[in-house]
């Protein structure tokens, strides 16, 4: 791609997200979301592969549907109350419809069906952008809307997302689909605690970005897109495979890794809010996610091909990929649990 075109598209991605962050008017927030969507579509289709084009088309249709729902809901609220302010979305129909549209944008269950299919058709770099950056703008609107939204709707979205995110990943062999279901489950954890403690949602979102970025960058460096390719990765780069396995276990919430922190804090807060049944369901759903992460780690570490190679292993050669970003993300994904009191002090 022409570097000037690439610069314009990346700038548009940043502009759209920033515009949505800074907006208090629904029309400006909607414009930011659409600028963001139009910029990412060209980046998604740059491979000129049928699967990439199909994924781009599916993404466009879902995002266009969500955008139409948001515009309709905002107009309905303005007609009923005379308010375009995001924090004054008080009409019940408009509030519920907007929340469902934003849930469709970020891939919350039961509006999640597009996400595994779209992520499967993209390369790992675009999958990383779709799983992290593209969720920031809609999630900012969800955070602002949460006080005026029906609590039962948020709880239902959260529970369904964690359960479906866990069940959906059990029978998958494609790594991108597994990470898509992981994203759905993590979004469920964030959305269910949003109505009680928004600060915990922000902590969970930040740690999710660290862990997901580390996972995508590790798999990209290992050139792995299927589970069976992980079995041959150990002989090529043992250090990379070891850290990748730990990152995946961190995504699953296994202590003493970073991913345990948000789940522990959220379960603790749900218990304080007298919701033991909800906390129990969330904990059981976390076990489902942890199972398929353990399966991936098993495939990487304990199923090594019984052969030797005479070729020079890649870790002895000069790599052409920068490992600085991966190293920083790995530190965040693996070692932040001891800093829990410090992080809590910063947000509370």
Swiss-Prot record:
EC class (word): translocase
Entry keyword annotation includes Transmembrane helix: yes
Membrane topology label: Multi-pass membrane protein
A molecular-function term among this protein's GO annotations: NADH dehydrogenase (ubiquinone) activity
GO cellular component, one term: mitochondrial inner membrane
Keyword entries, A-Z: Electron transport, Membrane, Mitochondrion, Mitochondrion inner membrane, NAD, Respiratory chain, Translocase, Transmembrane, Transmembrane helix, Transport, Ubiquinone
Major localisation: mitochondrion
Catalytic activity: a ubiquinone + NADH + 5 H(+)(in) = a ubiquinol + NAD(+) + 4 H(+)(out)
Gene Ontology terms: biological process: mitochondrial electron transport, NADH to ubiquinone
Transmembrane segments: 3-23, 25-45, 60-80, 99-119, 122-142, 150-170, 178-196, 200-219, 246-266, 274-294, 328-348
Location within or outside the cell: Mitochondrion inner membrane
InterPro entries in UniProt: Complex_I_Subunit_2, NADH_DH_su2_C, NADH_UbQ_OxRdtase_chain2, ND/Mrp_TM
The protein's Enzyme Commission number: 7.1.1.2
Recorded family membership: Belongs to the complex I subunit 2 family.
Purpose of the protein: Core subunit of the mitochondrial membrane respiratory chain NADH dehydrogenase (Complex I) that is believed to belong to the minimal assembly required for catalysis. Complex I functions in the transfer of electrons from NADH to the respiratory chain. The immediate electron acceptor for the enzyme is believed to be ubiquinone.
Protein name: NADH-ubiquinone oxidoreductase chain 2
Origin species: Formosania lacustris (Oriental stream loach)
Gene symbol of the encoding locus: MT-ND2
